[in-house]
């Protein structure tokens, strides 16, 4: 699998941990091992520009996802096809404010946001209550499982 992390923000982040979580998420969601993902960390100005351009919304946001080949989760017997999953763009400055509000670390917030972004790339959404329950449940399960996995490795 190809997971590229590019930090263009002024805030340091554990890029290796972001890559490990992305790989773990690929495994859990049965994404083909040759799938490609780009993770980009940008400052508030760059995120605001993307948010306006692609979502027609003012101000910076925490995470944006840009799907490419519209890959979907696979199964253990039949993983998703290989392809370009897409890009997840994170804004550490916005994430920092959210982390302080919720009482956890910036890195925990970035891990949550990246998982959220990958799930969007895999076709999950949270526009409707049932979709939200499903997506957020999967997101929680991935993060809890990854915390255990990462401690053991």
From Swiss-Prot:
Homology family: Belongs to the endoribonuclease YbeY family.
Enzyme class: hydrolase
Cofactor note: Binds 1 zinc ion.
Record-listed E.C. numbers: 3.1.-.-
Cofactor(s) annotated in UniProt: Zn(2+)
Signal sequence, start to end: none
Gene: ybeY
One of the GO biological process terms: rRNA processing
Annotated SUPFAM superfamilies: Metalloproteases ('zincins'), catalytic domain
Purpose of the protein: Single strand-specific metallo-endoribonuclease involved in late-stage 70S ribosome quality control and in maturation of the 3' terminus of the 16S rRNA.
Highest taxon listed in the record's lineage: Bacteria
Pfam families, alphabetized: YbeY (PF02130)
Lineage: Bacteria, Bacillati, Actinomycetota, Actinomycetes, Micrococcales
Record's subcellular location: Cytoplasm
Binding site for Zn(2+): 116, 120, 126
CC per GO annotation: cytoplasm
Name of the featured protein: Endoribonuclease YbeY
Record key words, sorted: Cytoplasm, Endonuclease, Hydrolase, Metal-binding, Nuclease, Ribosome biogenesis, rRNA processing, Zinc
Species of the source: Leifsonia xyli subsp. xyli (strain CTCB07)
Main location: cytoplasm
Record-level Gene Ontology MF annotations: metalloendopeptidase activity; RNA endonuclease activity; zinc ion binding
